Amino acid sequence: MKRFLQPARRSLLRAIPWLVLAATLPCLPQPMTAAAEPTPINRPWTGPYGGVPPFDQVRVADLGPALEAAMKAELDAVAAIAAHPAAPTFANTIEPLERATRDFERVQTIYGIWGSNLADDAVQKVEREMAPKLADLADRIFQNQKLFDRIKVVYETRKTAGLSPEQQRLAWLLHTDFVRGGAALDTEAKKEMAAINQQLATLSTKFSQNVLKDENDALVIIDDAAGLAGLPESQKTAAAAAAEARGQKGKWVIQNTRSSVEPFLTYADDRALRQQVFEMFVSRGDGGGATDNNTTIRQILELRARRARLLGHATHAHWRLENSMAKTPERAMALMEEVWGPAVAEVKQEVADMGQIAAAEGATITIEPWDYRYYAEKVRKKLYDLDESEIVPYLQVDKLREGMFHTAAMLFDLHFTPVPEGSVPVFHPDVTVWEVKDGQGKHVGLWYFDPYARRGKRSGAWMNAYRNQERFEGETTTLVSNNSNFVKAPPGEPTTISWEDATTLFHEFGHALHGLCSNVSYPSLSGTSVARDYVEFPSQILEHWLPTPEILSGYALHVETGKPIPAALVAKIKKAETFNRGFKTVEFLASALVDMKLHLSTPTADPDAFERDTLAALGMPREIVMRHRTPHFNHVFSGDGYSAAYYSYLWSDVLTADAWEAFTEAGGPWDPAVAKRLKSHVFSVGNTVDPADGYRAFRGKDPGTGALMRKRGFAAAAE
């Protein structure tokens, strides 16, 4: 989906993508026998705010050696814990494990930032070299029998050892993660699982690099200004700037990113160009050449299925959901199927409305996927007298950022101030840094903001925690980032974005606030370290403040006049808030259902055919494509994070819709009592409590699907 949290899973190996990295290796990497020489990246972070990443000292040549040194140091620390002569306790086993990851996590954070934001050929070479070694590190720890035996003792005695509830939960979490990582397998099964993880590590890296190459290299060049007919001036300017940056001055370029493609599909009058841009975008990873991902997908699915069977599960989906809120694939499927029918019915009405407008304009066409956004915008104009091009000039990134800060202050008493220029290193000139304090002036953390697309930056939008909040050995404050791919305006001009991108901006800021509000003892339980189908709840709830009158009137300011968005336009936005929800729900659910069915089925030899057949069986409207087609589905195949778990956005939205009604029932979006409960029971507790219990404490009840159906405009289905 447009939002991508990275990474959400935090436990002993908070920074190791141990099951998520993934072309098949003939053998395991050689054992680590000696540490590489430490580099500047390996040193503890110094400077203000409890230390900050030394981005100004990073050399790509140091990334591999730094990781090697950090991995060796972590293995040594783990070996010492496993060999401790005293009987296992929380203090001599679990807490030392929390310490053991810190040095490695600092290095892996920098490595991950370069891989996500600055992935040139040199960085990608390091990724290919290090992916299997990182997987090997994780296996060495999870399969350390002496270490697991100690963790098991602490886990089994957790309720009688005088541990706090948070300590008991951490003991449970570590034991659960070790079992899920193969710690309880016999020797031969452990070897097989390690071999599987090696192959998955390289395959997933290959998948993501193929997608990134297609996104970097593919583009549509427009030579004639007539091809820009219908586009707002801001998009024409951005396309001209993109062309100039690629040595095509005097022309216009549509880049292969969602923030460039979707506005073009919405406004461009030239149907043939819309089709060309659409086909470029949906063909990422599916071009039949060196970057084609279909064989890689088949290999990943086969390996995941083998691993699940080794661990005693029927399918990868059953293994994946064991520790989720949904618990089983069947429960996740039931929710998706409940929503699918009403959403498809809504799409049929949306298409009928489009057909009427097309016919009235004399267009004798059948609505195709590259027409949907274009004619949907015309329907919006007809039904609601609302044209999104009217809204875009009011959606300046910098002003919306201030609106997010206002939201954080009103809800959670968090206040943002830019750090003194040059006081905190950044990894790219586009990045800005803000100090966050609470209402008493106490330092809470730093927020890094990297809003613009660039070559080498993966697509989408995401939040990272560079450092987690913790306090079991003194207070450690968090460092979080939000990263987006907005098309940057020419120098000196404000960048404006679409309504959908503005919603994404607030969504990702919700993830950042989840990290900034964290108030826990142990880093493995901190911030966003929660179940995958819960982690999207704090982010999705924050989206609801964007369309509030206070945010729009105060921060949606016209890019030329500086005047606030007119009240009449705000009213139109409110009236049209459920417009096109059929399309949005179906394109998401199609991706989520294909993801789940891929991981419930016998691995397919032809992912493209599986996708087509599954969508046909579901009754997928021909006018829509999946939001993420399988060959570029980074959520699912560039790592394990959202595999068999893309449904999580819908599961979380059940909570989101119900939680928003808590505000409306209390009188409005700024109700202080509801906001206090939201912070106390959701945003601040991390993974210290079961998410179902945390939600119940906030809301006073369990959620149902009625609020979700009302939110999406499927009122009849909600009754």
Locations of the language-model features?
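Short pre-active-site segment immediately N-terminal to the catalytic Zn-binding motif
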Residues: V487-F506
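Short His/Asp/Glu-rich catalytic/ion-coordination signatures at enzyme active sites or charged loops
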Residues: G47-D62, Y111-M130, V153-A195, Q255-T295, ...
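N-terminal secretory signal peptides that target proteins for export/translocation
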Residues: M1-S11
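C-terminal, non-catalytic "cap/extension" segments appended to globular domains
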Residues: E37-V60, A69, A229-G230, K251-V253, ...
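Active-site-proximal, well-structured secondary-structure segments within enzyme catalytic domains
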Residues: E166, L170, T202, Q209, ...
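N-terminal helix-rich structural modules
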Residues: A22, A36-T237, F663, E719
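Intrinsically disordered or highly flexible coil/loop and linker segments, enriched in small
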Residues: K72, D76, A80-A87, D103-D120, ...
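Bacterial N-terminal signal peptides
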Residues: S11-Q30
